[in-house]
Every structure is written in structure tokens, then in C-alpha cells.
Amino acid sequence: MTVGARLRSKAASSLVGRRPLGRSRRAGDEETDAIVEHLEGEDEDPASPDCEREEGGRRAGTPSARRVHLAALPERYDSLEEPAPGDKPKKRYRRKLKKYGKNFGKAISKGCRYIVIGLQGFAAAYSAPFGVATSVVSFVR
């Protein structure tokens, strides 16, 4: 018996006698079966033609020892992924433009009002001496 076979049989016998914590042992426990299959699979000679290996390093046709855990999702599932980054800046940019547009419109309307009032006052002040002079001249005639 080789050293590898002795260690394999020792590991297999220790796994059979052990019971997983927190649950009862049932016949054909999947975890121990997967480990034992994995240990038994190492017995084959890697140079033999029937022992072809795949890219991942395991033999073709042998089941892997990995397990997939599935969980039921709640009815109202909110994904953890963020929305596409292209959508957010457009909305933000629109909001910013709208805000600046409102403020700019207010500034223009108030500014135009003050400019008109200022021009009217300037025109009245500018034309007042001539108006007075004209009325005085026409009165003197």
C-alpha cells in the first residue's frame, strides 16, 4: 500500500466517523461524499490517457466539490446596483440649468425694469433744462 493510499483511507475513515456540528448525520452526506470522491480521484495516474485534465485543473467528467447555495429573494427586491452612470448627470444637469435659467430670467427682468426707470429719470433730468428754456423762450416771445 502506498503512502497516498494509506492517507486517503485514513482520511476517509475519519470522515465517516465524524458528525457535522449543528445537524444530524444522514446517509450519504453530500459534503463528505464530495470530499471522499475528491480524495479517490487523486489515486489515478495523471499520465494515463483516460485521465485528461480540463483547463481548471480537474479531471474531465469528475464532479467538482463546490456547492452553490441558493436563497429565496423577498417579494420586494431592491437591487444593490446603482443605475447607469449616464442617467444621473443628465438629470442633475437639467435641474442645474433650470435653476440657473430661473435666476437669470429674474435678474434680467428686474434689471430691465431698473434700467428703464433709470433711463426715464436720466431722460427727464437731461431734457428738463431744455424744456424749461424752451418754455421760457416761447413764453418770452
From Swiss-Prot:
Checking InterPro entries in the record gives: RDD1
Name the residue ranges with Acidic residues bias: 30-47
Which segments carry the region annotation Disordered? 1-94
Q: Which membrane topology describes this protein?
A: Single-pass membrane protein
Keywords tagged on the record: Membrane, Transmembrane, Transmembrane helix
Q: Where in the cell is it found?
A: Membrane
According to its UniProt entry, one GO biological process term is: regulation of response to drug
According to the UniProt record, one GO cellular component term is: membrane
List the transmembrane segments: 115-137
Q: What does this protein do?
A: Regulates drug efflux through modulation of ABCB1 localization and activity.
Return the protein name. Required for drug-induced death protein 1
